[in-house]
Amino acid sequence: MSHDDQPASRAPARHRAGASYARGEETRKRIVAVAIRVFGERGFEGASTREIAKAAGVNAPALQYYFDSKEGLYQACGEHIAELAVEHFSPVVDEARAVLADEHASRDALFEAFGALLDTLVDHHLLSEHLDDHRLFMAQEQARQENSPLFEMVDRKLGARTRDASLQLVARYCGIKPVDSELRLRVMMLYGQVMGFTHGRRTMLTKLGWEKFGPRELAMIKRLAREQSRTLMDSWR
């Protein structure tokens, strides 16, 4: 074989390897998505790998190939949910921390940073097609073990940073100390006005007379959440 022939002979092999890897990743993601739903519906003990494999359109040995065990698959599900949250929230948390780094930041800038956190929470919980599956999975995990490694992982990667930024933004806006005994509860209540829409979404839509949480509906929720938050924060000064 000539030197000129070699690249042509290697290219198909590289293409096949790349295509095989892409298919493998697609299969892995499909299994994780199905497993999150099944674990959420039945819990870790009640879910069977055979059921998950069938629903994902793969044979049972495929689960062992990709995840080693049922425990490995369960952990991969938790990591997937955590990674999605980190990916979604990290940019806005970083922006909030940048505002906090400016000791001369205006009250408007501080509130806008907090409002962006509220907006991101709305988008994350109401735009996701798989929100209900993820929420059920997390609820099962919380019921399964009180000191959940999954919740500790989420808190380590995202929760602590988000919580700290939120507390400091509200504290500086209101002119109170971040260690104020009531501040943590107040911030939780500000976020709670948004989180209420994530539980029983179908029932909530029916009560509101909406067909879905579309762009118009989300814009209204964000606007009102900001208005109510600012009114409350002004009253705490």
Where are these regions (language model features)?
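Short Lys/Arg-rich basic patches
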Residues: 15-21
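Histidine- and aromatic-rich ligand-binding microenvironments
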Residues: 75-96
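Amphipathic alpha-helical segments used for helix-helix packing
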Residues: 126-149, 153, 202-206
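C-terminal peripheral helix-coil segments that are non-catalytic and often amphipathic
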Residues: 1-15, 116, 120-123, 156-185, ...
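Helix-turn-helix
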Residues: 2, 30, 38-80
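Hydrophobic alpha-helical connector segments
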Residues: 91-130, 183-190
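Short, leucine-enriched amphipathic alpha-helices that occur as contiguous helical runs
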Residues: 24, 28-36
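Alpha-helix N-cap/helix-initiation sites
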Residues: 46, 128-132, 176-184
